[in-house]
Amino acid sequence: MKPTLYTATGECVTPGRELGKGGEGAVYDINEFVDSVAKIYHTPPPALKQDKLAFMAATADAQLLNYVAWPQATLHGGRGGKVIGFMMPKVSGKEPIHMIYSPAHRRQRYPHCAWDFLLYVARNIASSFATVHEHGHVEWVT
């Protein structure tokens, strides 16, 4: 049985089916929120990353969510506990970007794709990055 998790506001979240796993953690369906998924870290992230995730969730808005699968709520092992993951919108029906930018993949998947489509994709990617920058989520380190 998977553990019950809690949002920062105390809502219960129960992880469902595992959708994928990577080096940092795993992504699960959420039983209570069918349009969202939970990324749960294998080990709790450092305090600085926990703070960053809380800031990201607090500043999620329609403009960001139009472009990116963005953290909408932090997840905790207990009420008021450490951040061990986050909720984000469930994305389906999308292609990994390498299917567009890799010529070999593009020829397989989109054989009639022309430059106008590639420019359209590039413009959307640029808009995504601009939106993230406008929301203050990029730090310049010198």
Model-derived regions: residue spans:
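Catalytic-loop of the protein kinase fold
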Residues: 122, 129-142
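Short, well-ordered alpha-helical scaffold segments within catalytic/effector domains
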Residues: 24, 119-122, 126
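Conserved structural core of kinase catalytic domains
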Residues: 66-121
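A conserved alpha-helical element in kinase catalytic cores
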Residues: 42-80
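Surface-exposed alpha-helical segments enriched in charged/polar residues
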Residues: 28, 54-58, 73, 127-130, ...
